[in-house]
Amino acid sequence: MLEESSEPGWLSEEVKTGTTIIAIEFDGGVVLGSDSRVSAGETVVNRVMNKLSLLHDKIYCALSGSAADAQTIAEMVNYQLDVHSIEVGEDPQVRSAATLVKNISYKYKEELSAHLIVAGWDKRGGGQVYVTLNGLLSRQPFAVGGSGSAYVYGFVDAEYRKAMSKEDCQQFVVNTLSLAMSRDGSSGGVAYLVTIDEKGAEEKCILGNELPTFYDQ
């Protein structure tokens, strides 16, 4: 008699974004980028998840950690920013969005496993990038996160330059993601980019076979 088959192990694993995420400021805006692989244990459960989540018209966040936790935080902040913008009659500031993410992350630090990079543009501060890890709130010229970040810290430190143009920042993000995706087993799929400036947000998806390649020399 055949024994009843047990459910696959990945069904009981927490779904995590794995992830490489990055954001960088340029004069007049920001560029965010992420890979698209989502894993549960050793199983890839989604190859094309967009980890760049809209918080408001000109504010996005990049998600890493538990997929459910990160998406929940993003949805909570999106709702609160919508209410806030209606109450004050103007678009929210990027720092306000980052502060909301920081407060939620810290309040539920024992229950949640997520790291969000918040970036966007507002008329008071221009392009801004904020790190919100474990209740920290820090503005940085650029930030990287996720499991793939360990493979690219040397690259970004060597390649980053002050006062980079929008096009240079876009290429910097693409190169960083491509390198991380080729090294980190938890990062992969396609690369998502969002460029935000005074005019609004422009989203772009770059297929895996269109990414630059990095080979060991």
Swiss-Prot record:
Catalytic activities: Cleavage of peptide bonds with very broad specificity
Active site residues per record: 19
Q: Which UniProt keywords apply?
A: Cytoplasm, Hydrolase, Immunity, Nucleus, Protease, Proteasome, Threonine protease, Zymogen
Q: Does the keyword Lyase apply?
A: no
The catalytic activity of this protein is classed by the Enzyme Commission as 3.4.25.1
Q: How is it modified after translation?
A: Autocleaved. The resulting N-terminal Thr residue of the mature subunit is responsible for the nucleophile proteolytic activity.
Please name the GO terms that the record assigns under molecular function: threonine-type endopeptidase activity
Instruction: Give the record's GO biological process terms.
Output: immune system process; proteolysis involved in protein catabolic process
Under the heading Pfam families, the entry gives: Proteasome (PF00227)
Name the UniProt record assigns to this protein:
Proteasome subunit beta type-9
